[in-house]
Curated annotation (Swiss-Prot):
PANTHER family: IMPORT ATP-BINDING PROTEIN (PTHR24220), LIPOPROTEIN-RELEASING SYSTEM ATP-BINDING PROTEIN LOLD (PTHR24220:SF689). It is a peripheral membrane protein. The complex is composed of two ATP-binding proteins (LolD) and two transmembrane proteins (LolC and LolE). This is Lipoprotein-releasing system ATP-binding protein LolD 2. It comes from Rhodopseudomonas palustris (strain BisB18). Belongs to the ABC transporter superfamily. Lipoprotein translocase (TC 3.A.1.125) family. Residues 5-225 form the ABC transporter domain. Pfam families: ABC_tran. GO terms for cellular component: plasma membrane. Part of the ABC transporter complex LolCDE involved in the translocation of mature outer membrane-directed lipoproteins, from the inner membrane to the periplasmic chaperone, LolA. Responsible for the formation of the LolA-lipoprotein complex in an ATP-dependent manner. One of its GO terms (molecular function) is ATP binding.
Amino acid sequence: MAEVLRLEQIKKSYNVGTAVETEVLHGIDLLMQSGDFLALMGPSGSGKSTLLNIIGLLDRPTSGLLAIDGVDTATLGDAALTQLRGQTIGFIFQYHYLISAFTACENVMMPMLVDRGHPDAEMRARAEQLLDRVGLSRWRDNNAANMSGGQQQRVAIARALAMDPDLVLADEPTGNLDSKSADAVFELMRQINRERGTTFLIVTHNDELAKRCDRIVTVVDGRVA
């Protein structure tokens, strides 16, 4: 299988108004291949969010190797890093961050609009196809504000897949949902993983959902436990 993500000795330090640096990640190693479905767990303050921001190319490590699809991200400038993020990584958050005045279809089109600059028929067709995949064809022209929490998160999943990413980062994607909706959203991600071979890294505090992943990585005090 193709290698999607490689972390070698990733460290991250911050200097917050003092001359002394505080290291929050201490040499993280992680390898993910195409089709992996991994849970990332750990207590609050363990470094999970910092690690996810680095993997998502929203922040840079202080040192260590971060490679996405075999590309050493340390060799890239900010513009190239933004392009790599947009083309290879999809994001799903605990809160859906949909634009409430936009329809489901318009929300799914947003990553494509950012990439291409203007809407077209191909973009619309792609969004409709993804909404069909997440079971929301009938609601594609509904405003996001008029949808249930479970439906909104399904739209967010469709949006994360808009650019056909190799890696999807899901940060507590079921955290705001009731147990029935959470299970349905988890199963949807699992089905997409199996059908499309999309790699998923899911941050969760839900032990039962984590056990249904292929692998669990636990971060404690900035280290893989």
